[in-house]
């Protein structure tokens, strides 16, 4: 019956009646038409008729919101009698479709790039196979003739037996490697093509506003998703079983190899029974929740619990700080977009490799048509590379560096989560009354069920949309060789700039250059790259002191030994500063000395330059190299070269000294010229004469050597060549270096070639080659570096070379950049006459030491000293002017951050001469400031142009006497608030830091005002807020404040992300894709197990060579062995750590959303889309047949 109007309600129209369904839902009966309706007929008069008329969260007439326990919120259109899971008031679905279409264009470009990369590798493989056959034929011919072209009568060493053997083995390894890479890329291309086609189908299916899923369809999809998840779970269990069987097979191979006998059944062997018994014992121990020896040894030890509790709290703080740092990093526009840029860089590099291989093909026994075809292909490649070099990429370089930093932080975060999980399990095993793991005491609660891999029993969309499927793709790493190449491209010239020469690394044998702070880049700089890095969250351990007792009080600038009056008395006063430029132009150092500039810490003549020498700035062509490379890798002064230094002056008239204090160092080793400051007790060292023209005419090459003990890899850097005019080379020819590690090995790439360059006075190469060799084998080898020229007829002619004995190579993970003389090929001695501690370059130097002119050197040093004194006086005047008009400096940032940000303008920094104090690991000039009182001028040298002075230069203070953060002197900050300022810069750090006495702190302090306030009764400093006012809003209790904040937090926690039909379709297709790829992995594992079982049945005791040579197979077998040896407790800890890592990743996304950098739902949707085209193959296919 019609309701009576009352309480402001409109009455129902005539003939209408309100009724209730069996479940209590209200519906309306129209007796006039004898029909029922869910729509209140009065809503036509009270509700908006369209979405355009809606205000706030209103729904128009005919729409109703419902809730399903399995789906969640859904919406009913009573007019059209349809349901949908998208909110019709939101525009999110349209934004999703737009993002999907945008990503399809990006993915299509990436697919095209990788297909082209695959095609280039195919060309390289075909060329390498042909070259391998021809080299084998040439070797057979030369072996039968018993003649060697490596003699003093011939300069052509194309078919020298040693070089030919190395080239054959290198080509053979190149063929094997290209086959493995092509097999891997083929599978990866297939996955990406399938993912791209899947996204296209989703776009066609879900485009348009009326293509969403209804309620019943969504429930059917959920049911299908559950079944797929069960299949994936069973597949993962089968994968674990296959991995364990692989571990057992590998163990059997190792046992047979060590014992020399084959065991038919591993389970019957006593060794295996012992292993099984030990594992059972560990499993029994894990059932009692005792983790390791700590729980058994100190179950009731209170001190142990306190120690673990402190470590646990410290790990949580570290994890929170890492989350903050990750959230502050700017994310890329699309997940995987940076991978596309990397592949474009690698495509350029592969084309360079192909071009180089086309230039060095064997012309013998080739038809004229084939030679013309190869020449046309070579010219086409050159044109493509010239076009690629014209695009700027500084922004790309910054993005790549940012990505490297993100990877470092993610790795640290993963290690911290594992440590946190381990400490928590140990605390649990000690006592049941240990720390609580509730969300209130831990930012990443292990007890939280969010982000779990297990699906909720209700099967809600929240569980289905978790990062289970998409999380696994984030931790996949790039191929090792690709990563090595990319890191070197980043480090070359401070970032990859295609407008300059593009670096080529032969045969993918490049080494990963250090990218962490405190390590050196590979731009040919003469630095020592230490393997020890400083964590990103830690500041520099030592900065310049501002106290009066500081070493900065000296007048001598750093790196300028010529100012020492005790060594050169009166020399600085004999020469007028105005006469210096004229006299300076006459000397051989010429303008190169002036080009370096006095603002770069006077780095030309330093007695202790081994820690970070400066050969890059010696050449005019290298002075344009961006400065960020130079600031990234400078190491401490203490980490100097153990035997010799690599700093060399432009003029080639430097002294040869020994850098070590003991008699172990070899003076003049390998023809190395070194610039160093002369101490009073070292005057017996003989400098070179200014008139010795033979030194200037000697061609020299700068070579860097390093052995990485972690990866057992030997790295050779061909940095630069100078004084090429010593050889008469036609302009039509091109020069390059050929590097050979002799005697050659069949299983190691031993021959490499740099890219070719036209003959100029100085040539910059910056090529890096990597050889996987053990220390013992490396000490038995000799490095041979030949300077070769190639004419249009592809005739390889060896002009000069040098040989370096590796018997005394220090294995310290540091790069040693040294200059070597290039002896003409007719004068180069045979390697049989080498001495272990003396190299041919060193012996060739001995006759050059006879003509000595000490007066010329003294005059040069005197003029330089006078110039430095004049510059000091000018700088002192400029400093006085700067003190009268001080510039505002930014709040305290550490030295590392400031110089990294300022590296984008290397020219300005070169002129400003901003130094670092003793022990600092980063400076624009790679040579650190030496210790001692002569370093005061390091911070007193302003820029030559004050207008170019970078803003925000930090105030350097002594960390040993001051524990406060450096703040702006003009910034009104109370001393009591310094801790809070520090907490804003480093969040989640306790504010209760014990600050030592400020009595001996350097620098001026702001006025200390003492005032006692009731609102701040525990302090005696100036109040930041207004004085105490009773009953004011700010004085409300914490209980009231918590009550106000709790509803907001609760709503945020309960707020579910908006789900659309597109999200549901992506989840379904991602599950199907994951299941398909898992089946491929299982098939590959079954094939590998079958192959190993067949080899075992045939009596083989060693693993196949293809498995041993492939790093991916080695990684797979190590992972299988690790999983087989894990106990149940360790497996549980790994699962907890993975769950915690997933929760931490959600926290990072939430923090990014709070900082308004990127909405969380946008991040999640982009990850879903990128999952389909980011195929990472963890199980490689079976290796190809060997050559």
Curated annotation (Swiss-Prot):
The residue ranges of the C2 domain are: 697-820
Q: Name one GO cellular component term.
A: cytosol
Interaction with PRKCZ, as annotated region: 1026-1045
Phosphoserine, modified sites: 286, 1017
Biased segments, Acidic residues type: 875-884
* Keywords attached to this entry: Coiled coil, Cytoplasm, Phosphoprotein, Repeat, Repressor, Transcription, Transcription regulation
**Where is this gene product found?**
Cytoplasm, Cytosol
State the Pfam families in the record. WW
Q: Which Gene3D superfamilies match?
A: 2.20.70.10, C2 domain
Q: SUPFAM superfamilies from the xrefs?
A: C2 domain (Calcium/lipid-binding domain, CaLB), WW domain
Q: Where is the WW domain?
A: 10-43, 57-90
GO MF, one term, reads: signaling adaptor activity
- Please list where the region (Disordered) is annotated: 438-464, 830-849, 874-963
| Predominant place of localization | cytoplasm
Query: Is-annotated flag, keyword Repressor?
Result: yes
**CDD domains given for it?**
C2_Kibra, WW
Q: Name one GO biological process term.
A: hippo signaling
Coiled-coil residues: 121-194, 224-256, 302-423, 859-885, 1063-1143
Modified residues annotated as Phosphothreonine in this record: 999
User: Subunit comment for this entry?
Assistant: Forms homodimers and heterodimers with WWC1 and WWC3. Interacts with DLC1 and PRKCZ. Interacts (via WW domains) with LATS1 and LATS2.
The family note in this entry says: Belongs to the WWC family.
Its job: Regulator of the Hippo signaling pathway, also known as the Salvador-Warts-Hippo (SWH) pathway. Enhances phosphorylation of LATS1 and YAP1 and negatively regulates cell proliferation and organ growth due to a suppression of the transcriptional activity of YAP1, the major effector of the Hippo pathway.
Name listed for the protein in its UniProt record: Protein WWC2
The source organism is Mus musculus
